[in-house]
């Protein structure tokens, strides 16, 4: 299939040639607009007054609204309140925002546009919309244009997309192109008092999330105020097809609207007034308003995705008659403050919604922008406390997103990430010094490798070597690399086979049943209905028998359950078969699965609401749950989680299981029900243990008392931002506890002490061992020096074998001895390695090592060898 960029190029030409077919031409004409073709870019556009150019900043004179009051001046949140008030008369329903972490949308880490809230299920028609016509104030994250943030006024990593969405289904038409464009023009012209003569409508194409359609962009004075997309088509491997649900997807950035209405030089001062006041005060930066006003007008041409920012700077400098170096000196420190304001707010919302900085998934982007903040602070030597910046965001932005006022975890996250950043800085200097002279650092591929391997940002390089010109396309390239790959299904071809009815979802206690054979692929049997649980959601498959033939596995492929027989037997299509499920295995898997839910709930109670599930496994031996957390668990936290989990078990919480429409589940319980990731289907199964509610298709106990006992057996930080907890349940948990007690008893008996005295006794033995080890080391070093001194009295090389297993100790002995024997050679041999150093003009120590070692590295003066020859 074509990429988004390729498809957009193809469709842009097609839609322009057939504009009357794809755009609401007649309605636009009735509103007084006429069509023109831009003499510079060639696009079609509509205006109430005759124009030669389309109003794009690159086709005109940049942003011409700065310093002017073009329309009614509005506040940040007021922009959305007025949208709701205007669209209320047409029956639009305002929605509560979705989390910016898009766990419901496979292949996406974050919400990048408001329409993502309804993809893939609503837009594809699989699931009904929350209402036929809705509005939203959705926080979005985008990381492909980080270099532009702080420079253009329109670029943010985190921003509010005010959305107008209409869902036309085959059963019900609501509004589409004609009504949609009229409604938005009324919002701009009547509500916001934007003169109609100042409004320009662009014809364009929108592509995203596998969907596309014509769109109309609303421009005024060089600024795109909104984009109304008419999603009609879905891309397929064969081309494209018309969607069953046709959608209006309009997005307008709240940040852009409030900036445009104010006429201020930069949007960030209007969006973050309290944060910027603090940043200016702490850094004592006073921007030159005359220079900034001129720069801001032409900053519209800056776009790191399309061209080099360095080149754009030179172009702007020429336009406004200022030396490019002087312009950068004036602009960049303030732009750094704007970036810090933007990045910290984006981080705040993302962490609050359940993502953490890390080296994996969406966490990669969060670490990226946080480290950029650290680097900018260091580069310009700013006196900025990021915790105070976050507190101001919570106060300021919390007036709109009130749930942010409860956020506390982010302060811990910043502290830990700062420590990791400082470790990176200490390693960076040496690496950069080696590469600076070669010119490699101007290459974007080199920058990407440095960041991925060592966590080194371009800002950190610039801080250490200001004279080096760096590529401005680093962050856009990094975002391309880190986009999640689409999954491709493999396995057995089940096309044409009807999906299996999953009986266990409603009758999980049924252990024997009859079913019809509807297909057989080698040893894999497909039934019309099954109560065997296939491997999915981290839970192992059931075992048992079909017609007395033991099962080897049970798997599901594209909704079809495949029962793998342990031996070959041919069945007739339509044949009735008797099935028996292994009760004991199912019971153990069931209590393990429920225990994993309970432990997940306990981690949220103990560690905080930032915890999300990042994976799980449920077997008959033990369970595993991976949680999103920014550091390894302390022993006290580990024990507290176990305690809280067992309190829930003891409490006897009844499990609530029901299958309900997806929209109803999301509305009632929120988007955190997707702890196990995206769940397909119009209806989803909800499992609730008290306040812990998840969309889950697994088997579960009826009451937490059925679990009996949960024993946490280990926790480890398996990757950045993810902690794995292993657990055992029921009788197996008791067996594990007894095994641990047996080991403790054996140790106590061995030392002839009580259980309570074991820790102190172990500590005493450890201290004695350390003391003995130190004495042995001192004796070995002393003996080695005597042997070397004695040998070198009569010979030019001291070749000595020592009982040493520590390579660094061997090197230390040889190097210190060589300082005293300046015309001699020393070759020391340890357990399976050797080290030599030569101050003798005729002794090649590397050759000497080759005589006794299989592998040697170094030169004739100093070398080390490995794998002693036998």
Where are these regions (language model features)?
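Cysteine-rich micro-motifs
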Residues: 48-62
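A glycine- and charged-residue-rich anion-binding loop/surface
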Residues: 10-25, 29-35, 42, 58-870
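N-terminal alpha-helical interaction blocks
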Residues: 2-12
């Amino acid at each position: 299939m074509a990429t988004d960029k390729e498809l957009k190029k193809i469709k842009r030409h097609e839609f322009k040639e057939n504009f009357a077919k794809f755009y609401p031409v007649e309605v636009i004409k009735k509103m007084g607009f006429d069509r023109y073709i831009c003499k510079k870019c060639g696009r079609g556009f509509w205006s109430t007054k005759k124009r030669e150019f389309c109003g794009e900043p690159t086709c005109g004179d940049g942003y011409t609204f700065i310093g002017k009051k073009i329309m009614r001046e509005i506040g940040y949140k007021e922009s959305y309140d007025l949208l709701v008030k205007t669209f209320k008369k047409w029956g639009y329903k305002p929605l509560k925002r979705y989390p910016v972490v898009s766990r419901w949308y496979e292949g996406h880490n974050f919400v990048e546009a408001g329409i993502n809230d309804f993809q893939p299920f609503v837009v594809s028609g699989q699931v009904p919309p929350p209402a036929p016509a809705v509005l939203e104030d959705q926080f979005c994250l985008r990381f492909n244009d980080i270099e532009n943030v702080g420079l253009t006024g329109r670029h943010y990593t985190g921003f509010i997309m005010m959305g107008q969405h209409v869902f036309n289904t085959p059963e019900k038409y609501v509004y589409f192109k004609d009504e949609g464009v009229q409604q938005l023009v009324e919002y701009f012209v009547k509500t916001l008092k934007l003169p109609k003569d100042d409004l320009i409508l662009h014809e364009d194409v929108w592509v995203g999330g596998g969907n596309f359609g014509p769109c109309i962009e609303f421009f005024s004075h060089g600024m795109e105020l909104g984009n109304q997309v008419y999603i009609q088509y879905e891309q397929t491997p064969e081309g494209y097809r018309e969607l069953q649900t046709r959608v209006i997807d309009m997005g307008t950035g709240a940040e852009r609207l409030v900036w445009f209405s104010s006429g201020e030089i930069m949007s960030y001062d209007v969006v973050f007034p309290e944060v910027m006041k603090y940043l200016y005060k702490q850094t004592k930066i006073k921007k030159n308003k005359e220079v900034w006003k001129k720069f801001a007008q032409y900053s519209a041409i800056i776009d790191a995705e399309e061209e080099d920012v360095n080149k754009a700077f030179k172009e702007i400098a020429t336009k406004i008659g200022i030396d490019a170096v002087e312009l950068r000196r004036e602009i960049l420190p303030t732009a750094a403050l704007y970036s810090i304001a933007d990045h910290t707010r984006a981080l705040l919302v993302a962490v609050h919604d359940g993502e953490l900085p890390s080296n994996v998934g969406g966490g990669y982007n969060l670490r990226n922008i946080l480290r950029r903040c650290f680097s900018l602070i260091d580069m310009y030597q700013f006196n900025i406390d990021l915790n105070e910046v976050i507190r101001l965001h919570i106060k300021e932005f919390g007036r709109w997103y009130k749930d942010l006022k409860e956020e506390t975890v982010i302060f811990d996250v910043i502290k830990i990430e700062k420590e990791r950043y400082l470790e990176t800085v200490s390693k960076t200097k040496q690496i950069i010094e080696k590469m600076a002279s070669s010119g490699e650092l101007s290459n974007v591929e080199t920058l990407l490798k440095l960041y991925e391997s060592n966590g080194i940002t371009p800002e950190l390089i610039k801080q250490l070597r200001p004279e080096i010109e760096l590529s401005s396309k680093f962050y856009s390239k990094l975002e391309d690399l880190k986009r999640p790959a689409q999954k491709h299904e493999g396995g057995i071809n089940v096309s044409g086979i009807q999906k299996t009815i999953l009986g266990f979802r409603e009758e999980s206690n049924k252990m024997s049943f009859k079913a019809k054979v509807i297909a057989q692929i080698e040893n894999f049997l497909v039934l019309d209905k099954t109560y065997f649980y296939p491997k999915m959601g981290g839970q192992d498959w059931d075992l048992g028998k079909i017609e007395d033939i033991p099962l080897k596995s049970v798997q599901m492929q594209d909704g079809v359950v495949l029962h793998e027989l342990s031996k070959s037997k041919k069945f007739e299509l339509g044949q009735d078969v008797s099935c028996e499920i292994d009760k004991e295995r199912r019971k153990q898997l069931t209590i393990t699965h429920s225990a994993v839910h309970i432990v997940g709930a306990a981690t949220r109670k103990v560690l905080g609401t930032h915890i999300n599930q990042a994976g799980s496994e449920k077997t008959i031996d033990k369970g595993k749950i991976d949680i999103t957390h920014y550091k390894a668990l302390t022993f006290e936290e580990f024990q507290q989680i176990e305690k809280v989990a067992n309190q829930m078990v003891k409490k006897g919480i009844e499990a609530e299981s029901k299958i309900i429409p997806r929209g109803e589940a999301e509305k009632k319980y929120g988007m955190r029900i997707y702890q196990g990731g995206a769940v397909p289907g119009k209806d989803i199964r909800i499992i609730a243990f008290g306040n812990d509610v998840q969309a889950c298709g697994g088997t579960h106990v009826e009451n937490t008392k059925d679990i009996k006992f949960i024993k946490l057996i280990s926790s480890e930080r398996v990757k950045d931002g993810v902690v794995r907890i292993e657990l055992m349940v029921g009788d197996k948990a008791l067996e594990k506890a007894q095994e641990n007690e047996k080991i403790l008893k054996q140790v106590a008996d061995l030392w002839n002490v009580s259980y309570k005295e074991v820790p102190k006794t172990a500590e005493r033995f450890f201290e004695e061992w350390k003391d003995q080890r130190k004495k042995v080391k001192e004796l070995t070093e002393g003996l080695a020096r005597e042997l070397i001194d004695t040998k070198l009295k009569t010979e030019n090389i001291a070749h000595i074998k020592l009982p040493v297993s520590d390579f660094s100790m061997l090197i230390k002995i040889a190097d210190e001895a060589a300082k005293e024997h300046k015309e001699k050679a020393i070759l020391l041999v340890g357990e399976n390695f050797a080290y030599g150093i030569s101050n003798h003009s005729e002794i090649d120590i590397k050759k000497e090592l080759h005589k006794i070692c299989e592998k040697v590295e170094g030169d004739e003066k100093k070398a080390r060898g490995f794998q002693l020859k036998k």
